[in-house]
């Protein structure tokens, strides 16, 4: 409804804010910090929640920081979502691209969250299928029914060729995905090391395929 607040953590994927505005919502960003590995801290989330808060958008691993929410932070976030009756849109498109033996935990798996979570995923990242434009949503039936009222008139259906490619990826793509993940891991280590060696303060991302160096010390006063 107009005036409903949609909370999301920043830095973030570029579409969250304009998508909220297009739906007549009020965007409410919450900053994340390098010192916290760009995890959303429950206390930061609690500080922006109001009686108008309706939705929380999560994206872990995060575009563009590669940040990953710790289990402790996710549990605290889940408790706040239950307490404030929030719907969570959990964008987990990078969930397979995690490094340093970190297991993925979906907030939908935590107590009280399955019935209030819309989980978004797709084939673009883990299977390198960005051009196929194929994704999916998992949510309670009433939420899916509401989403379909818009989806059936705007998106129609996924191309048959994309669906066939996705089936092949699911049935036979695990080994290729793991090779790619290992390659990304090696590239991450190289890029982060080299950026730090030349004077950039670069956080080592826990997932996704981005690095997010701090260049503030290299900028002139006028940017």
Where are the language model's segments positioned?
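PLP-dependent class I/II
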Residues: 1-223
């Amino acid at each position: 409804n107009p005036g409903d607040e949609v909370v999301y953590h920043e830095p973030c994927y570029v579409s969250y804010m304009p998508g909220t505005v297009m739906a007549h919502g009020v965007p409410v960003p919450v900053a994340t910090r390098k010192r916290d590995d760009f995890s959303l801290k429950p206390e930061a989330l609690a500080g922006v929640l109001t009686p108008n808060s309706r939705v929380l958008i999560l994206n872990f691993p995060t575009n563009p920081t590669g940040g990953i929410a710790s289990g402790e932070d996710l549990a605290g976030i889940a408790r706040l979502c239950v307490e404030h009756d929030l719907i969570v849109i959990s964008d987990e498109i990078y969930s397979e691209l995690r490094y340093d033996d970190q297991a993925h935990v979906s907030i939908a798996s935590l107590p009280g969250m399955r019935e209030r979570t819309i989980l978004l995923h797709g084939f673009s990242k883990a299977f390198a299928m960005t051009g196929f434009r194929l994704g999916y949503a998992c949510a309670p039936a009433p939420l899916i029914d509401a989403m379909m009222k818009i989806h059936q008139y705007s998106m129609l259906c996924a191309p048959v060729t994309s669906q066939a490619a996705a089936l092949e990826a699911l049935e036979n793509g695990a080994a290729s995905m793991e090779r790619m993940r290992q390659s990304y891991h090696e590239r991450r280590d190289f890029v982060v090391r080299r950026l730090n060696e030349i004077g950039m303060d670069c956080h080592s991302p826990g997932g996704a395929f981005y690095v997010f160096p701090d260049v503030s010390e290299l900028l002139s006063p006028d940017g």
